[in-house]
Structures are given as structure tokens and as C-alpha cells.
């Protein structure tokens, strides 16, 4: 590949030279910027590429060895043409969704606008040209808008416009994407580091650590590459795969190779620390905000897409309820936008949250007065001001486009604390950014509690899976959102509480996690499994069921957890019903979720997704058919395919539940609860980011002698393999296919874990074990 790229670039350079000579003969117009170096530049990487006469192939990736990167909205480059020159044609080849300003000056101090270089609809690098009548000595190109990921391949200016087929006749080359170069360095470092982890031995002399020098050198080159790329948003996947792979090698070395190749604990610990820090950093993009503030022309910490849904739903739930978000958003946009005409409604598409069907603005226009009437005049003005922040920040097109999502789907229990947080805060970058810090603080608290409960090494493995999985990504992750990881933290803290013997508190916390997002309640339901196994063993031994007192003595921990869960459910349902009304909150939420949970969605994962998949009816395949609307036809095909395979769905579901219940035998209560989470993708149809709970699964098999525990190693290796499999799934650009592949990965991994734990349970608690005659014995789940 390198040789091919070298040949291509050599040919391109020769073409530049040949075209230059032919231009002399034919008196073609001269590019006034050809070969010039910038007079001034700010925040521009490789400015020499801007005037080297070489363009990227149309549609190529935005960041390659042919392009120059503008690192921020304040980046610019200025050129001195050597004197006043007539300007009639300009060319800029840049990333399609970038917006630039070309300015002119006679003295290099006073600038006037010459050309607004707008965005292009087609993806990748795209050339823009314009004809004009002007003159200048100095030219400036500055980034002004777009997604803040700016790159330019070429700038050209002409006193006379070149003849057709310009600019197609200019030299082009396919650049090597920077992500490939970074990925190669990650691969080299990973291979060297992995080899060292496997080969080194604790008993060998210190001289063996000379082998670490190539590892350190490769690591330095990798870090230098990423520092040069910063800020970056699409180069994290290789780092996530690296963290998962190295952590898996550490646990393999300790669990399976310790007798002959006993590792040095300091090396293992240092490797895990590196993996955990890397994985944690990739989730938070190493501190770089994800979204662009169109009003301020820079990046913002606010997750604008997520918070434009959950901020208003929380603050104005009494008015919006679960069906009014998009109608009110549209009405506020109309009121806030001078010149918006009724005819413009025909171009607006939004999801009707009553039935999840898509409709045009014209079709719902008659409902806008009704949604305004839900508000008092003062509250409506407040809502308008808050939504104006989001429409200004997102831009009108993205703001209106976001109304094709599914609204806010959180339960009334989630809405309660979010309402208390936002009710007195006007929507602003400061207020929502501060609220967005709640989640990382909660996550760090969870990691600290896991450290105190299970030890540092377990905590490091948990952090690695937390950051290395791709389940939390759907275009972006939830960095910058508020209370979107609270349910994960509640499940983790509940696990730690039960590990410490605080079963009432553990049950309460796990039930709280279930009340926030519903399907995590599987952990709470599995509190019944130890009681069921105790009753089965008692009946098998004595042919009668145990008394309530005997169950209380044997399974007191499970009963205390159930009481804690019941207290949580009853109190919070009562409180939210008192605040918001039971019918307007819980019944309305139930109706909305019943619609949302069964309708096809491209980023949903699980057994239902796999069984609804037909490669001949994917959106990609349907898009190649004439007269086909791929996404509408795709949804119909999903429903029909799943309906035909529904019996298979129930058969696999019953098998998974049986394995899950069998895996619970002989295990402690917190382990049983986490095993219950393994059934979520079999029973439900969750969005991919809700499967982020996989990072908690190492706690289901955490044992005191971790470095010799093969069960922990098997589970960790399976989870790491899932992370690696997700890395390869990212090559698929069609979202329905990508998340179908990730569904296969998820189900295969969980099936292996369930089968292994079920097989192991037969040794932890032999089938139908006899009970002592004197008194009922506590099962392992109570110990």
C-alpha cells in the first residue's frame, strides 16, 4: 500500500510539473498562490500543503497527508501576493461541512469580505469555486462555521479564470488518512506491549526489562501522533481496542500462564493503569467537547442533542408530559423566528409522540395552539427563551431535525431529580455545562467505591471495560448530558453495598436504577432466584416446601434486599404520582414505552434485532432498489421478518432464562443480581447505549485470589473480545448493519458467559443438594 501511495504521489507531482510547462506554452492563467508560503498563520497544521498545487480526490476523508488542518474557528492563513492583483476566480477545496471566509486587503490590516465558502451536501473533501471582480494584495482564509473539524487541501486565486474542465483537470491524489497512520502506530505499540506482557517473567533477571525499551519507544511515537492530532473525535476506537486487548493479555497471563511464566505484579499493575487511563480518556475525548455551538462559533461542553430533549421534558413536564415536546418545540421556534411562514411548515418533519409516526409540520399545525394553551403566558415565554438557546446553539436545521427522534423516554423517577436541578435554571451554556458535571462526578464516585469494596485491580478492570466498549456510542456518547449514567451508578453502588453485607441498601439502590430506566429492574427480579433455589432444594430433600421462618433464616439477605427494593418502588412511585399525577406520569410513560420498545430502530440491539435481520432487506440493500425508500421499507421488513421468527425468539429466550437461573446457584446475592443483567438483551430491545452496563459484569465473578481465578479471566476475556469485535464493526457505515453486528457480538458474548457460569454452578452447588435435617442451611446466596 505504501508503495502504491508513493507511486501515486510521484505521478501527481510529475503531473503538476507537466501542467506547469504546458501552461507556459498555452498561456493558461497562473495561480497567484502557487507555491507561496503564508505571510501569517494561526492554528494551521501543514500550511505548505495549501498551495502545493495538489488536491485531494473528491470525496476523500477530511484529514489526510494531502490536507492542512485548521484546528479551531479562530484559525486563519494570510498570503501576500506581492502587489495588487486582479481577482476573477477563486478555488478552495475543503471538507464538505466546513464554512470559511475569504477576505481581501490592500495593506494587510483592513480586511473586506471577498467570498463566503459555504458547505457542500456531498461528503468528504469538496472543491468550491467562484467568479468575481476584485483586486487585492493580501488574501486571508479563515474558518467560520461547520463542525469545527476543519481541513483544506488547496487554495487558488486567478486573475483570469482557467478554461474548462477546470478545476477537474488539476492534479489530484488520494491521501493516506491520518487515522490509518495513527492506527498503525497503535497496532505496533500494542503488539510490542502485548508481547512483553506475555514474555516477561518474575523470576528472570532485571536484564529482561531491556525488552521494554522498544515498547516505550513505540508508545512515545503513538502518544506524539495523537498529541499532534488533538483535538480528535474519530481516532479513539484503536485506543479502546488497545486498552481492551492489553487488559485481556494481563488476565490471561495471570490466570493461565502463572505457573511457568509468573508475571511481575508491578508490570501487570502498570499495564492495567495505562489501559484504564486510556479507556477513561477515550470516553471523554481527552477533555475535548463533542458539540459545536453555532451561535458562538466554537465547541461547547453541552450535549445539545440530548439536552434539547431532556432539559425541557424535566423542567416543563407538567405542561409537556410525554407527548408534547416536539409540538411545543415547533411552536416556540415559530414564535422565535421572524419571517417564519405557514408554508414553511411543509418542510418540517417531526415524530408524533402519541404514536411514533412521522408527520409534516402542516399536518400538526392545528395542534400548535393547543400545546401553547398548556402553558401559562409567563411559562410559555420562559419556555420560548429556553428553547431559543437550543435553536441558536444547534442552528435551525439541526434543531428542527432533532424532532425526528423519539422524545424523552425517561421514567417519572428520573424526571423528579432532573426537575429539581433545572426548575430554577434558565437554559444556558453555563447552567447546562455545570449540570453536565454531575455524571462524571457520580462515575468517579462509583469507581472509588468499587476500589474500596473490591480492591484496585478489580476497579481497573471495570474502568477498562467502561471506556473500551463501543456500546455507549451512537454518533456521540453521553458526555455533556445530565443524569444519563445515574442508573449505572445506582446499580454499581448497589452491588458494592450488598458485597459489604448491606442488603437493604443494595436492594434499594438497584431498584432505584430500575425505576430510572426500567429494564435494569432485571437485577432486582433476580433477588428471587436464591429463594427459589433454596425452596427447590428443600422440597427435593423433604418433599415439602419450607416455612416462611425457614426461608427468612436461610435467605435473609435476599429478603432484606427485596424489602429495600419494595420501599424504594412504593415511595418513589407515590412521590412522583403526587407531584405529576399518576395518569399523566406513569400511565403515559407506559403507553409511550410500549410503542417505542417494539418499533424498529437502527441503534437498538439484542435478540429481537438479530431475529429481525435479513441481509437482503437491510437499508443498504434496499437503497440499491429502484423506487425504494430504504428506511421506511427497512422498518416494514424488520417487523415482517421478526413476526415470522417469533417462535424462535421465545425458544431462545427460554433457554437464556434457564441458563441465567442455573448460573445463580451457589452464588452471592450481588453476583445473582448482575447475572440478571445478562438477560436484558434477550428479553428487551434496548438502545445500544443502555448496554453500557457491561462494564459492571466483572463484579459478578470477582474473587479474592483474582490473579489465579480462571472464571474471572474467562469473563474478562469475553468482555474484552466483545470490545475488539465492536472495533471492527465500526467499518460498517450503515447504522442498521453496524448495530446488528454489535447485537451478534453482544448475544454471543453473553451466551458464553451464561453457559460458563451455569456449568460452574453445578460445582458450586451440586444439583438437588441434600439439606441437613436439623436446621435449614443458608444457601450460598446468603453467605
Name each region found by the language model.
Residues 112-132:
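Extracellular carbohydrate recognition and processing domains
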Residues 701-777, 783:
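Aromatic-enriched
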Residues 173-503, 531-688, 695, 767-770:
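Primarily membrane-embedded glycan-assembly and transfer machineries that use lipid-linked glycans
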Residues 510-515, 523-537, 678, 693-701:
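Hydrophobic transmembrane alpha-helices of multi-pass, membrane-embedded glycosylation machinery
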Residues 141-148:
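Short beta-strand-plus-loop segments that form exposed binding edges in beta-rich domains
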Residues 2-12, 18, 27-28, 207-215, ...:
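Short, intrinsically disordered terminal tails adjacent to the first/last structured region
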Residues 27-84, 93-95, 116-122, 154-180, ...:
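Disordered, acidic Ser/Thr/Pro-rich linker "stalks" and the adjacent N-terminal cap
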Amino acid at each position: 500500500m505504501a508503495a502504491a501511495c508513493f507511486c501515486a504521489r510521484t505521478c501527481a507531482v510529475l503531473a503538476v510539473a507537466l501542467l506547469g510547462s504546458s501552461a507556459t506554452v498555452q498561456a493558461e492563467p497562473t495561480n497567484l498562490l502557487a507555491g507561496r508560503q503564508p505571510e501569517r498563520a494561526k492554528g494551521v497544521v501543514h500550511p505548505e500543503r495549501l498551495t502545493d498545487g495538489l488536491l485531494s480526490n473528491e470525496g476523500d476523508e477530511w484529514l489526510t497527508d494531502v490536507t492542512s488542518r485548521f484546528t479551531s474557528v479562530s484559525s486563519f492563513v494570510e498570503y501576500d501576493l506581492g502587489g495588487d492583483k486582479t481577482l476573477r476566480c477563486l478555488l478552495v477545496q475543503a471538507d464538505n461541512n466546513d464554512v470559511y471566509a475569504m477576505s481581501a486587503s490592500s495593506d494587510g490590516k483592513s480586511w473586506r469580505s471577498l467570498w463566503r465558502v459555504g458547505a457542500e451536501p456531498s461528503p468528504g473533501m469538496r472543491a468550491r469555486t467562484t467568479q468575481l471582480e476584485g483586486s487585492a494584495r493580501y488574501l486571508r482564509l479563515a474558518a467560520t462555521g461547520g463542525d469545527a473539524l476543519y481541513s483544506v487541501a488547496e487554495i487558488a486565486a486567478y486573475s483570469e479564470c482557467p478554461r474548462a474542465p477546470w478545476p477537474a483537470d488539476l492534479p489530484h491524489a488520494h491521501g493516506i488518512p491520518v487515522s490509518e497512520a495513527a492506527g498503525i502506530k497503535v497496532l505496533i505499540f500494542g503488539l510490542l506491549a502485548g508481547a512483553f506482557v506475555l514474555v516477561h517473567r518474575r523470576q528472570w533477571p532485571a536484564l529482561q526489562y531491556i525488552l521494554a525499551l522498544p515498547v516505550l519507544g513505540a508508545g512515545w511515537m503513538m502518544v506524539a501522533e495523537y498529541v499532534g492530532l488533538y483535538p480528535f473525535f474519530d481516532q479513539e476506537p484503536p485506543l479502546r481496542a488497545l486498552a481492551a486487548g492489553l487488559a485481556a493479555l494481563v488476565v490471561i497471563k495471570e490466570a493461565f500462564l502463572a505457573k511457568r511464566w509468573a508475571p511481575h505484579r508491578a508490570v501487570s499493575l502498570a499495564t492495567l493503569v495505562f489501559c484504564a487511563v486510556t479507556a477513561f480518556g477515550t470516553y471523554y475525548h481527552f477533555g475535548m467537547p463533542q458539540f459545536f455551538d453555532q451561535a458562538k462559533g466554537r465547541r461547547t461542553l453541552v450535549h445539545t442533542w440530548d439536552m434539547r430533549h431532556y432539559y425541557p421534558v424535566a423542567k416543563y413536564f407538567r405542561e409537556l408530559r410525554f407527548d408534547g415536546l416536539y409540538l411545543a418545540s415547533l411552536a416556540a421556534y415559530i414564535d422565535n423566528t421572524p419571517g417564519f411562514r405557514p408554508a414553511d411548515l411543509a418542510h418540517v418533519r417531526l415524530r408524533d409522540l402519541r404514536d411514533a409516526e412521522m408527520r409534516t409540520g402542516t399536518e400538526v399545525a392545528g395542534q400548535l395552539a393547543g400545546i401553547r394553551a398548556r402553558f401559562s403566558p409567563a411559562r410559555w415565554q420562559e419556555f420560548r427563551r429556553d428553547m431559543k438557546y437550543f435553536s441558536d446553539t444547534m442552528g435551525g436545521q439541526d434543531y428542527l431535525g432533532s424532532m425526528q427522534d423519539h422524545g424523552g423516554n425517561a421514567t417519572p423517577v428520573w424526571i423528579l431529580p432532573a426537575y429539581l436541578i433545572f426548575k430554577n435554571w434558565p437554559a444556558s451554556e453555563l447552567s447546562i455545562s455545570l449540570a453536565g458535571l454531575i455524571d462524571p462526578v457520580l462515575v468517579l464516585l462509583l469507581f472509588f467505591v468499587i476500589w474500596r469494596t473490591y480492591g484496585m485491580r478489580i476497579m481497573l478492570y471495570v474502568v477498562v471495560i467502561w471506556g473500551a466498549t463501543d456500546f455507549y456510542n451512537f454518533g456521540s456518547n453521553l458526555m455533556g448530558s445530565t443524569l444519563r449514567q445515574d442508573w449505572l451508578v445506582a446499580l454499581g453502588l448497589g452491588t458494592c453495598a450488598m458485597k459489604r453485607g448491606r442488603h437493604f441498601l443494595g436492594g434499594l439502590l438497584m431498584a432505584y436504577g430500575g425505576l430510572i430506566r426500567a429494564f435494569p429492574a432485571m437485577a432486582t427480579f433476580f433477588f428471587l432466584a436464591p429463594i427459589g433455589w433454596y425452596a427447590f432444594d428443600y422440597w427435593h430433600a423433604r418433599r415439602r416446601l419450607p416455612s416462611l421462618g425457614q426461608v427468612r433464616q436461610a435467605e435473609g439477605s435476599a429478603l432484606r434486599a427485596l424489602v429495600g427494593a419494595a420501599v424504594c418502588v412504593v415511595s418513589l412511585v407515590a412521590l412522583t404520582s403526587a407531584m405529576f399525577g399518576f395518569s399523566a406520569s406513569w400511565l403515559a410513560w407506559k403507553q409511550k414505552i410500549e410503542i417505542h420498545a417494539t418499533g424498529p430502530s437502527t441503534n437498538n440491539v439484542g435478540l429481537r434485532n438479530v431475529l429481525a435481520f435479513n441481509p437482503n432487506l437491510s437499508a443498504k440493500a434496499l437503497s440499491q432498489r429502484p423506487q425504494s425508500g430504504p428506511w421506511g421499507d427497512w422498518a416494514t421488513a424488520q417487523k415482517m421478518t421478526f413476526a415470522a421468527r417469533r417462535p424462535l425468539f421465545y425458544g431462545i429466550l427460554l433457554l437464556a432464562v434457564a441458563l441465567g437461573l442455573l448460573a445463580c446457584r451457589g452464588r452471592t446475592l450481588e453476583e445473582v443480581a448482575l447475572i440478571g443483567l445478562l438477560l436484558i438483551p434477550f428479553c428487551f430491545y434496548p438502545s445500544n447505549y443502555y448496554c453500557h452496563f457491561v462494564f459492571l459484569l466483572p463484579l459478578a465473578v470477582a474473587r479474592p485470589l483474582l490473579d489465579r481465578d480462571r472464571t474471572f479471566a474467562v469473563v474478562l476475556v469475553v468482555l474484552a473480545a466483545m470490545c475488539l469485535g465492536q472495533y471492527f464493526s465500526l467499518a460498517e457505515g450503515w447504522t442498521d448493519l453496524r448495530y446488528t453486528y454489535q447485537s451478534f457480538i453482544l448475544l454471543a458474548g453473553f451466551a458464553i458467559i451464561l453457559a460458563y457460569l451455569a456449568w460452574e454452578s453445578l460445582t458450586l452447588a451440586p444439583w438437588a443438594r441434600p439439606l441437613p435435617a436439623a436446621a435449614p442451611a443458608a444457601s450460598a446466596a446468603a453467605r
